[in-house]
Amino acid sequence: MRILTICGIGDIHWVMLKMESFIEKECKGVIPEITVWNFDGRPRADGFVSRIPFVKFAGYDNEPMGRQQKRLFHEMYMEGFKDVVSGFKGYDYFICVNGSLRIGHSMETIMRQYSTNWNYKINTEDCISPYSEPYIIFYFSNHGMFTDWVAKMPPEKIRSFMQQIKGYKLILTGSSWDSPFNQELEDNGVINLCGKTSLTELFGLIKGASAFVGWCGGNTIVSQHLNTPTLMLWSNYFSHRAFQTNWVDPDRLGKVYIPMDVETANNDSLMKNLGVLLGK
């Protein structure tokens, strides 16, 4: 069984919430091969898929999008017209639930014939933090759609917030393409690890962190799944507010995961919600 997914870690995580039930009903007990469509030229999901025990990573499909492929991608990624397509690009299935989540559908109603496992297994036993003292990790970027986030919460506002946090090491994380922006956030001993960690090292940092604060990305999406307190910052770039919570285990809402809008966030509200997650 060959399954194609899109390329982001968060995108794949949302599919995996349904995958065990999908395998049981459609794959007849055979472990499916997951190929990641690397249409944006930023391969970053192999280390994630390889950690999921009920699937096998089969590599990347590096073919760019053609016109007809873009049309279907838009329907699945943006509009939620489809979640599962058979035979696309020669694969048994192409699965993408982003569009349905984006327009406000709940995970329980997406691919409703398959149950949701909010606690599916990600193998992270070898992911160990190098820090013994308390620390908080952060994810900020000005890449792609995140220019909208930065317009509402620019570097000086981020630095002002981080300066309010006492008693924790502050660690910036992200990919190599996030590094130039995060250099603007280095202040008062802040540690910048953007582009300097493998996925194994990042997962170790996430597991050992007192909290993770930052934009809505694959890293913060997986953070709450690993039960690290996660303060996720959203923008009205996404019109449906349900998208902030419709993919999260209801038992984690308000306890492990709190969403906020960058448009209205200030130091007081950020510190209040961070305090809730830290148990203060």
Question: At which residue positions do the language-model features occur?
Answer:
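Catalytic machinery of carbohydrate-active enzymes
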Residues: 1-280
